[in-house]
């Protein structure tokens, strides 16, 4: 990581809340340790590259035992070996998160091998950018997106949450998108699946609050990854590096905020609430200004992106792991 990027990551990690926790709250009786990740067992999905890999490295640097999850065993082994070589502790758990039996096996392996999971980062996912007008006969786009973005993390949480409840402590971080606030055109499949996970976790957080289990939804802005390459409109837009995005995830693990938003997303949410029809008109113009990609129109297929317009995000266990948030 170059020096400017390292400085930005450091700034993101040093929030006022973190400063108070480390300098004030840590001295109070019964307070969490100044380094709340030390000794924690943290499972990170989509950990073979991108945000997931960067998150795993940051967690290991803070003394956590990291359980690396993705489909590609070779990529996971590389990340595990590099973390171990840097003095950290990591274990590779290859898993196809789109396969329910594989997820159930992952839960059993994590519980048997490590005695439980203290914190979970639901980072793996899939993004599709395609107009609904081009999706009349593509129900499978919505099914595939829900499978990895919603059903997989819910199944994983249902397997790991009982142990957290029994111990009276646990935390789940969901890597989402500011699109859940913006409701950006052409991302119906992607944003709907992320919104489902956002809502599920908010409700679970209320039900499990009394048991010491909390949830954070990180509504991520655009992240500079390979996946945004086919979308020319993104080329000149500002974007986070995977390391900067991972710093937000680590902040969520350490400080346990309810949500981490970005200002444009919050402003768009207010706009949608205060002037919904005007918002529709504005986003309709945006929709026409940025047309579907050639891949989404079925004219070409991006390398390693699967069906037209379908790409992996969040360093998930797909053909090539990477992430984007509209």
Predicted region positions:
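C-terminal helical subdomain
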Residues: 217, 234-273
């Amino acid at each position: 990581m170059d020096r400017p990027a390292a400085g930005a990551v450091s700034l993101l990690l040093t929030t006022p809340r973190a400063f108070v926790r480390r300098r004030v709250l840590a001295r109070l009786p019964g307070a969490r340790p100044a380094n709340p990740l030390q000794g924690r067992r943290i499972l990170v999905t989509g950990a073979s590259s991108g945000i997931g890999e960067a998150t795993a490295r940051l967690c290991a640097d803070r003394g956590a035992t990291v359980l690396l999850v993705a489909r590609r065993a070779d990529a996971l082994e590389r990340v595990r070996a590099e973390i171990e070589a840097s003095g950290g502790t990591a274990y590779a758990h290859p898993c196809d998160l789109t396969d329910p039996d594989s997820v159930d096996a992952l839960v059993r392996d994590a519980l048997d091998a490590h005695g439980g999971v203290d914190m979970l980062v639901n980072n793996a996912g899939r993004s599709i950018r395609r107009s609904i007008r081009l999706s009349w006969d593509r129900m499978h786009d919505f099914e595939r997106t829900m499978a990895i973005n919603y059903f997989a993390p819910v199944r994983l949480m249902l397997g790991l949450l009982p142990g957290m409840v029994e111990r009276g402590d646990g935390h789940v971080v969901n890597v989402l998108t500011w699109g859940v606030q913006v409701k950006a055109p052409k991302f119906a499949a992607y944003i709907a699946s992320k919104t489902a996970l956002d809502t599920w976790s908010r409700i679970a957080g209320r039900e499990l609050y009394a048991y010491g289990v909390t949830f954070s939804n990180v509504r991520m802005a655009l992240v500079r990854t390979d996946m945004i390459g086919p979308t020319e409109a993104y080329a000149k837009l500002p974007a986070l590096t995977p390391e900067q995005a991972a710093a937000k995830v680590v902040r969520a693990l350490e400080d346990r905020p309810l949500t981490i938003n970005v200002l444009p997303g919050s402003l768009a949410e207010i706009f949608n609430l205060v002037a919904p029809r005007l918002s529709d008109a504005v986003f309709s113009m945006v929709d026409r200004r940025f047309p579907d990609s050639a891949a989404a129109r079925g004219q070409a297929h991006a390398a390693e992106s699967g069906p037209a317009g379908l790409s992996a995000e969040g360093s998930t266990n797909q053909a090539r792991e990477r992430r984007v948030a509209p």
